[in-house]
């Protein structure tokens, strides 16, 4: 941002180690907060604003609508790395050869003791420049190396996670495509089966039109042979013989239709008799 007149910086708010600053909207809690390491309290006229110290992600927020909170930095140590990893320990054969020699045996006399002490001191001074051990690293360098290693580990872990997520997404999408294709094939096969059943179940069209009128059945003329005539004559003869025999056997019971009609007419002509007359008539007939 560019200002015609630079704002007045009232103060700079920084977070402690392991913490970060969260600038959250106090009126709209649904809005995502700004998480930064340090902010400036800037004043323009009578109003004050919060401005990010990191110019790569600039923002200018009114102090009356936003609140500043200190939150713990959510960092997970994916791999425990010691701080003394960068210190090199000399353990080669050359270092063993450059070790100071054992001091000689000290004699009882005072002169000899002084000489032996001088020899030991001289040997140690000679061995010191020869060995030249590596100086231990400072705390800042250790922290830098530790941060670099953590950053590399995080990058590797992120790549692995991304590759796994991509593989899982591809696998799930492939499974979804396969299931959808199978369902489509099943639906198409069922639709084809239903269509074929419907097609075969349709009634065939009529051979004649309604305007032509009803179709007259054709009488099949079968040729009449002499064998059929003989069989029919024999059947008639046998039936007539049977009728005659039955008539002769039942002469008393057989009554022709004309006689039946006459008896019915006579019975209708006779007046109806009472019960006593009928009884008398029955007795007379029985005596006769």
From Swiss-Prot:
Compositionally biased spans, kind Basic and acidic residues: 143-152, 278-288
Protein's UniProt name: Uncharacterized protein CT_504
Low complexity bias spans: 126-136
Basic residues bias (residue ranges): 153-162
Family (UniProt): Belongs to the chlamydial CPn_0623/CT_504/TC_0791 family.
Cross-referenced InterPro entries: GrgA_tf (IPR054977)
NCBIfam families reported for this sequence: GrgA
Chain positions covered by the region annotation Disordered: 126-227, 258-288
Lineage: Bacteria, Pseudomonadati, Chlamydiota, Chlamydiia, Chlamydiales
Extent of Acidic residues compositional bias: 180-194
